[in-house]
Amino acid sequence: MRGNNLFKTAALSAVVGTLALAILMNSSKTVRASQDENADQNGESLIQRGFDVTPVPLNLEGKNRALVGLGSYIVNVVGDCNGCHSAGPATEFASGGNPYFRSPIFTGTKVVNTATYLAGGRDFGPVGSVLHLYSRNLTPNNTGLPVGGRTYEQFVEIMRHGTDLDHIHPNCTAPDTPANCFLPPFNGDLLQVMRWPSFQNMTDHQLQAIYEYLSAIPCNPGPAIAGAPYLQNTCEK
């Protein structure tokens, strides 16, 4: 009898152990599935969404596809870079494609105006009596480098530190300082409108992705604005 009880106890223990192992394995699979899903949310699905939403044809020759797709996602979905780096709200969207309007002016489908896409020229001025701040042209020039020919190292300097490499608006320091200078407390060495204090917290991988995407979009000559020749790109090679 005692042996029989021992056998039953051992059998019950084996069943309980098997169930516990099964539960543990199933839980592990669930965790792995959740981790895989989270990884995908930061991987291929975002890359594909980036390709889905880009409004312009892309030159992928010599480019890293994954970086281009992720860069498009950051630029077009997360950052809404075109909201500032186009000529302004009036021309940001194509005719009939402005989602802020109502029917029948808005036809129901958002359509970005490719003629002004990321080409800069939005006026954020005036500051004071004469100073106008214009968003920069982010498209590549005829060198193939974005932001009007910036190297990746220069791009990182802009994004991490807000450095205005064009030095468009110097600090007002002397009577002969040009009229487009910055009065204190503003620092003319830095970009004053761009949200670089937020962008500087991006990872190196994210900055690489943005740069790769901007390298893949078409060159846009940019708007012709008096006193702002720095907005224009040379597209002809």
Model-derived features: positions:
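Ser/Thr/Pro/Gly-rich low-complexity linker/stalk segments immediately outside membranes or between
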Residues: S28-E37
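A cross-kingdom feature marking solvent-exposed beta-strand/loop segments within repeated
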Residues: P178-N201
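Electrostatic cytochrome c docking/interface patches
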Residues: L46-N76
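Bacterial N-terminal signal peptides
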Residues: S13-A22
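Electron-transfer interface patches adjacent to heme c in soluble/periplasmic c-type cytochromes
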Residues: G79, Y100-R160, D164-I168, P197-L207
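Surface-exposed intrinsically disordered loops and tails
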Residues: G43, R49-D52, T91, S95-V127, ...
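The canonical Cys-X-X-Cys-His
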Residues: G71, V78-P89, F155, I210-L214
